[in-house]
């Protein structure tokens, strides 16, 4: 799992579930505690002026007051309790549904009534776009809702360059028919100047290790969502000839967030699992604690050395 992207994408996925609940006539809420700069354009699409209830988005504290034994809790884009916005919410009801495209680990949501996990899907957005098409209630998405789902696919696939299959394009085509507009989505995903400069700095100061691995640090000061910028920098580094995998470290809130990316030859998921993280073949991440940035870089280099010697990567 690439943990630094979860906060940026989570709100996108939750809004898809809300769309289904709305058509079914069921009251629904999105649990979100912090609205970052990356989420703000998405949240602004779902205001009271646009026909959405004022209490569409609620905090974890409010959710814990509202939940009862009849509440259905839907977990999207993760199957690990600690990666959810409010892990305690999962203990308050027995009706839990999980939608995810990440491989399961030992730490999973326990006893869901439905667990739809498809590791071969490009994104949870792709999965839910498919499900929405087969509702007997004939769900009609609003253009702004289709925009958000389309944006989620773009983010997870790095503009259709990673983990993209036939189903991905079919989901995108469905969303375009629902009114998703590429220009609006592009504006939604733009960075501010400070974030753009930080990403450029991370790419500029990258070091090449053993001739094929790019390792860099993303500065976190003056940026509202530094971990997302670090993930973007990791994607950028793959555009350099000869780089098989990239690793960008972002020190933030007492942790070192590691974003790792590859194109096809290196399984970064295996590398990140050695560091306590996980993800996919080409997109993965980890969170390191109790170490400095230099110590984290050394851990990555040592892990690469070990795996090269053992033949786990080439």
Language-model segment annotations:
Residues 77-80, 133-136, 257:
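Short, motif-level signal for alpha-helix interfacial/capping segments enriched in acidic residues
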Residues 17, 90-93, 114-115, 171:
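Glycine-rich, phosphate-binding/catalytic loops in enzymes
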Residues 101-172:
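Short alpha-helices
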């Amino acid at each position: 799992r690439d943990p630094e992207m979860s906060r940026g994408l989570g709100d996108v996925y939750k809004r898809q579930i809300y769309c289904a609940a709305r058509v079914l006539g069921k009251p629904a809420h999105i649990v979100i505690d912090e609205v970052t700069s990356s989420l703000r354009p998405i949240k602004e699409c779902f205001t009271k002026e646009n026909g959405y209830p004022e209490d569409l988005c609620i905090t974890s504290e409010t959710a814990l007051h509202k939940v009862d034994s009849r509440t259905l809790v839907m977990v999207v884009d993760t199957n690990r309790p600690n990666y959810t916005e409010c892990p305690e919410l999962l203990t308050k009801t027995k009706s839990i549904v999980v939608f995810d495209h990440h491989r399961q680990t030992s730490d999973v949501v326990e006893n869901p009534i439905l667990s739809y996990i498809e590791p071969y899907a490009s994104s949870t957005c792709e999965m839910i776009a498919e499900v929405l098409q087969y509702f007997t209630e004939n769900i009609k998405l609003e253009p702004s809702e289709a925009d958000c789902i389309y944006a989620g696919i773009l983010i997870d696939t790095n503009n259709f360059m990673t983990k993209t299959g036939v189903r991905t394009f079919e989901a995108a085509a469905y969303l375009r028919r629902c009114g998703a507009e590429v220009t609006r989505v592009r504006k939604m995903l733009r960075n501010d100047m400070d974030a753009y400069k930080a990403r450029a700095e991370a790419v500029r100061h990258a070091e090449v290790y053993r001739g094929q691995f790019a390792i860099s640090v993303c500065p976190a000061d003056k940026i509202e969502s530094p971990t997302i910028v670090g993930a973007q920098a990791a994607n950028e580094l793959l555009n350099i000839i000869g780089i098989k995998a990239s690793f960008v470290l972002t020190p933030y809130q007492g942790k070192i967030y590691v974003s790792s990316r590859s194109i096809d030859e290196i399984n970064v998921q295996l590398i990140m699992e050695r560091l306590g993280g996980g993800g996919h073949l080409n997109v993965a991440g980890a969170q390191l604690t109790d170490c400095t940035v230099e110590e984290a870089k050394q851990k990555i280099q040592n892990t690469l050395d070990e795996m090269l010697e053992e033949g786990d990567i080439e």
